[in-house]
């Protein structure tokens, strides 16, 4: 399995598949926000940023999957998935165990050199409450679904990182 994951990490297909899944999730988030009129909270926006990190890592990996640039993509992927797990876990706990003392910020805080909420307010401005339950599917709230998705991204990222020393076997069908 590790040899297979190493082989996949050196091809564009797996990286593009990951980019497609992250882009589909981002578009779904925008659908919820602009069509279903659900208000994203601060943690939702940070979770979006983590998902954009996974998307960016996938695009970097797809550019040059056989070069050391793929290792940069894997580190970004691992970090983004880990931060996504942290954020969605915190968000899930805020929704499952609401407390007047445990709240999220009122505004998204981006660095001054990267004010995404000013540049693209349709995507990065938060207007909802983190503890408010707005949507569920099969009994799970949106942060719980995202927690599962980020855990899956993280597990696969760890396995792909572990697989890097395992070189793919050369298949010689007609040799002895």
UniProtKB/Swiss-Prot annotation:
Required for disulfide bond formation in some periplasmic proteins. Acts by oxidizing the DsbA protein. It is found in: Cell inner membrane. The keyword Metal-binding does not apply. This is Disulfide bond formation protein B. GO terms for cellular component: plasma membrane. Keywords: Cell inner membrane, Cell membrane, Chaperone, Disulfide bond, Electron transport, Membrane, Oxidoreductase, Redox-active center, Transmembrane, Transmembrane helix, Transport. Belongs to the DsbB family. Disulfide bonds join 41-44, 104-130. Signal peptide: none annotated. GO terms for biological process: protein folding. InterPro entries: DiS_bond_form_DsbB/BdbC, Disulphide_bond_form_DsbB, DsbB, DsbB-like_sf. Residues 1-14, 66-71, 164-176 are cytoplasmic. SUPFAM superfamilies: DsbB-like. Residues 32-49, 90-144 are periplasmic. It is a multi-pass membrane protein.
């Amino acid at each position: 399995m590790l040899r297979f994951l190493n082989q996949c990490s050196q091809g564009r297909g797996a990286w593009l598949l990951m980019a497609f899944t992250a882009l589909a999730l981002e578009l779904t988030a925008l659908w919820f926000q602009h069509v279903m009129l659900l208000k994203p909270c601060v943690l939702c926006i940070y979770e979006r940023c983590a998902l954009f990190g996974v998307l960016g890592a996938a695009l970097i990996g797809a550019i040059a999957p056989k070069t050391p640039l793929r290792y940069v993509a894997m580190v970004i992927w691992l970090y983004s998935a880990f931060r996504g797990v942290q954020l969605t876990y915190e968000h899930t706990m805020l929704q499952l165990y609401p407390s007047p003392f445990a709240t999220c910020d009122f505004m998204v805080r981006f660095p001054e050199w990267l004010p995404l909420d000013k540049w693209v307010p349709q995507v990065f401005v938060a207007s909802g409450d983190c503890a408010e339950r707005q949507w569920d599917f099969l009994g799970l709230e949106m942060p719980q679904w995202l927690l599962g998705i980020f855990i899956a991204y993280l597990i696969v990222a760890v396995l792909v990182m572990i697989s890097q020393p395992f070189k793919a076997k050369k298949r010689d069908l007609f040799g002895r």
